[in-house]
């Protein structure tokens, strides 16, 4: 069971881990060259070498005790799908641009062009595409498949008493002019929702908390940890 441990309740030990990790399933990480997924992130945390975007090898000096892969819930897995010419998102104009992008600058231009698709209400202060906007760049089948990849990787790598994994993701609540506060949502065990609550569902953290309360009524426990106010 993910999140479980064999350490007794009377034991007091210092454990070291990371609850904020992005992989190629996150749009910002993908645009910056990351292609490895949750499996590689967990292997790295346990001391295994993994390839870096530059072609070198990355290896942590001391393995961690616990970790959660917390990819962005918004557009989870969509960037890799856009980069695939055989997928639906890969046939979108921005997908075609991404496939043909040769430089980091070009990828960043596509990244900013996608703000309208993250935020069709224009809360962030970027261009408001209007009330008739159709988000043809968001395929929830892709999002749910990526979410399942996150779940499966956590379950595969969990070794109670040796290395503990948590299923989680990042929720970003936008405010005017991109004033935001990021929250890592960490689930207690293996019972998790079918898909994460994302900024496309609501920009209000109160709505996130209400969603978590509804999950709790179903026996699904989660904790939202604020971690970053960048852009605020």
What is the role of each PLM region?
Residues 1-232:
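Extended, charged catalytic domains and RNA/DNA-binding interfaces, predominantly
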């Amino acid at each position: 069971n993910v999140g479980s441990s064999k350490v007794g309740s009377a034991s007091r030990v210092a454990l070291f881990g990371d609850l904020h990790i992005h992989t190629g399933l996150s749009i910002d990480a993908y645009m910056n060259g990351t292609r490895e997924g949750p499996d590689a992130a967990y292997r790295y945390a346990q001391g295994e070498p993994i390839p870096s975007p530059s072609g070198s090898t990355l290896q942590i000096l001391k393995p961690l005790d616990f970790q959660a892969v917390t990819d962005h819930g918004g557009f989870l897995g969509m960037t890799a799908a856009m980069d695939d010419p055989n997928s639906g998102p890969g046939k979108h104009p921005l997908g075609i641009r991404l496939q043909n992008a040769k430089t980091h600058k070009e990828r960043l231009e596509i990244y900013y062009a996608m703000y309208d698709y993250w935020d069709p209400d224009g809360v962030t202060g970027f261009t408001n595409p209007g009330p008739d906007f159709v988000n043809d760049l968001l395929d929830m089948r892709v999002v749910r498949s990526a979410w399942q990849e996150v779940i499966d990787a956590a379950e595969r790598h969990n070794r109670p008493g040796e290395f503990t994994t948590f299923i989680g993701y990042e929720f970003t609540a936008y405010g005017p002019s991109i004033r935001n506060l990021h929250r890592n949502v960490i689930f207690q065990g293996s019972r998790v929702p079918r898909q994460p609550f994302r900024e496309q569902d609501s920009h209000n953290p109160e709505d996130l908390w209400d969603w978590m309360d509804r999950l709790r009524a179903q026996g699904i426990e989660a904790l939202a940890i604020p971690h970053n106010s960048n852009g605020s």
